[in-house]
């Protein structure tokens, strides 16, 4: 079922994924149960997000199964030309554009108007070069349920001293933060060499 959903994205949104970027886009580490996709940025489905780079995605097992604990549970990282410290407004505004564009691109029912996405975030912690955010994305599920859903979200924004840019890691799930789905999600992490140096050395 997951593969069917990925094919739908590929057809509907003209997602760019190429073997020549395979090494570059191996930005996240997760075990073999997680499916992977990569998307070129700017997004074809959300061109209003005006950055250049790549999105590296990991989908939990059962991402497309309504009855699975992994339903709509996934993570992605943006490796983009972003050199301004991100704020709650940045994430709220850009995730609205992202999900509105994605759901409208996937939607096949022209008789309905997709409701606008609502987002809310708070900055939770700042530790060295990592700033954490927590919040929600309320959006229309054009893939499976055809209903509004609320995704709980955490974001870790990493500052790379060598490249002088910020790299945000997003984790999403409709499950409560105490659910075991979040134990799985938190095991999806950035690779140590994502900043062309070791994450332990980021200051």
PLM features per residue range, with description:
Residues 27, 60-65, 143, 155-156:
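Catalytic micro-motifs at enzyme active sites that drive phosphoryl/nucleotidyl and oxygen chemistry
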Residues 62-142:
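Conserved polar/disulfide-associated segments of primarily extracytoplasmic proteins
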Residues 4-13:
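Sec-dependent N-terminal signal peptides
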Residues 15-19:
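Sec/Tat signal peptide C-region and signal peptidase I cleavage site
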Residues 128-202:
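Short, well-structured beta-strand
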Residues 20-58:
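N-terminal "mature-domain start" segment
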Residues 14, 48-50, 158-160:
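Short beta-strand micro-motifs enriched in acidic
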């Amino acid at each position: 079922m997951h593969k069917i959903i990925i094919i739908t994205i590929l057809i509907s949104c003209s997602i760019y994924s190429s073997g020549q970027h395979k090494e570059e886009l191996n930005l996240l580490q997760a075990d073999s149960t997680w499916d992977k996709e990569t998307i070129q940025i700017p997004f074809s489905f959300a061109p209003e997000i005006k950055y250049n780079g790549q999105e590296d995605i990991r989908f939990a097992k059962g991402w497309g199964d309504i009855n699975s604990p992994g339903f709509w549970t996934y993570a992605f990282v943006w490796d983009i030309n972003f050199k301004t410290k991100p704020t709650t407004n940045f994430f709220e505004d850009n995730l609205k554009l992202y999900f509105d564009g994605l759901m409208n691109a996937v939607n096949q029912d022209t008789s309905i108007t997709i409701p606008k996405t609502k987002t809310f975030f708070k900055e939770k912690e700042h530790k060295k070069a990592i700033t954490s955010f927590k919040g929600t994305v309320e959006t229309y599920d054009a893939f499976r349920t055809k209903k509004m859903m609320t995704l709980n979200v955490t974001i870790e924004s990493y500052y790379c001293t060598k490249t002088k840019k910020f790299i945000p890691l997003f984790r999403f799930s409709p499950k409560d933060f105490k659910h075991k789905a979040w134990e799985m999600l938190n095991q999806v992490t950035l690779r140590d060499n994502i900043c062309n140096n070791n994450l332990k050395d980021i200051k």
